[in-house]
Amino acid sequence: MRFKLLLWIFIMACSLTFGLAKASARTNSVEFPAGLPWLNVTEPLTMQQLKGKVVLLDFWTYGCVNCIHVIPDLHKLEQKYGNQLAVISVHSPKFDNEKQLSTLTSIVRRYGMQHAVVNDVDFQLWRAYAVRAWPTFVLIGPDGKYVGQTSGEGRYDVLDRAIEQLLAEFKGEPNLKPLPIRLLDPLNTVLAAPGSLAVDERYIAISDTLHNQIVLLDHQGKLVKRLGSGIAELKDGHSDSSAFSSPQGLVLTENALYVADTGNHAIRRIDLTSFLVTTIAGNGELAQGRLVPGSTPTEASLRSPWDLALDKTTLYIAMAGSHQIWTLDLQSSQLKAFAGTGQEALLDGKRLDAAFNQPSGLALRADKLWVADAEASAIRQIDLSSGKVETLVGQGLFEFGLKDGGFKRALLQHNKDVVVLDKHTLAVADTYNHKIRLLDLDERQVMTLSIGTELNEPGGLAVFNGELYIADTNNNRIVRWHLKDQKLTEVQVPATAKLESAP
């Protein structure tokens, strides 16, 4: 009776995607297919060796912001249940680039995943468990039987209750043997997965994302300042007494540097005279459900702000986790939704009726705001005068590739940033194609820029003084392309920029 009650709670609370069999008729779990690549373990796992533990399978794809949002919940469950629970992230990749073990390895390291990861490249496990969405959680009981599944964020409480109940109901011998976990070695580089940058006549500002810090250089390559302790937390203060968490987009002004502090779900301001870091929006908590502004910006819960653009006193925010663009008025401190309903879709029209797909990059010029709409592999344009949203390049969530040509035919793959090169041209960080693409706004054509080097998931762009700066994220470096001379150089970041004990 208690087990039937458990199943009822699990079904009702989670809105399970498929009905569950009665306890007496539950089916066996599916064995992990031989030959799949594994990370964070010394050997492939089997369902047989996991018997006696509750097994939680987390089906995800690494470019999905919703999948990133649930990683802290997985960590909490691991910490609470220890060896009674086996958490396994089953990576079922959406994009072609995500199938590569090398890029998956970079992501597992970037997000500090502490449990086993298996790369389900051909969707064998996905199909076996009839999964339909990312993220989806599948529970296997200690008896090795399938219990149920649920999809989406905010499932910690119901998973916690179900795991606790499954352990209580199990009459067999518990399996407390530790799994053969061996975590990836940390990066030993000056920069670690730099995600974004901003450049003006004084500074080259870099989001040293995996080191949870901001690096300020001058144009001679001298370190001006490191900001952030390296510990992933939300903490205001001066220089290294402050703290960030996976910072991304940056905007430089005469007096300040604004930071999209993605992992903290916050917007930060760095005073460029005192180097005091303050939080100007976000309370450090991930908003669950629909985003609401809050009585003040710092009381609001945000969802993975990824990039910023500034127009006088209006700060535009690419709110990747809510599939929207928000604005923060720096004078009135008013925070509000600017474009997008919050639905994940490729819908044009009036800005508040339109829909976006994990917007990750912004570029602003005069009355136009361009959006790198990553999950739709699209570039969107918002006319700030008329309020109209238009898709320039991109055909939908599952249409992607590497194709030049007219806007209607061209294809991108999970592009994460966009900048204005001149009044006729946009440059796009075509992240999963490892390319820089150029969009001719007059001829409505897309071409690939040949820069003579192998990029690896470039995540951020900046333009200054005839040079295109590129955050070459998975190569842990910054490079610049001289637009006139067609030459590439690497920005030499001094060793003093490296954290003494990077986390």
Ranges and model annotations:
Residues 141-196:
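Thiol-/selenol-based redox modules, centered on thioredoxin-like
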Residues 46-65, 88:
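Short active-site neighborhood of thiol/selenol oxidoreductases, capturing the structured segment around
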Residues 105-140:
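Short, internal strand/loop/helix patches
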Residues 22-47:
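N-terminal "domain-start" segment that seeds a small globular fold
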Residues 206-210, 259-263, 317-321, 371-374, ...:
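Conserved beta-strand positions in repeat-built beta-propeller and related beta-rich domains
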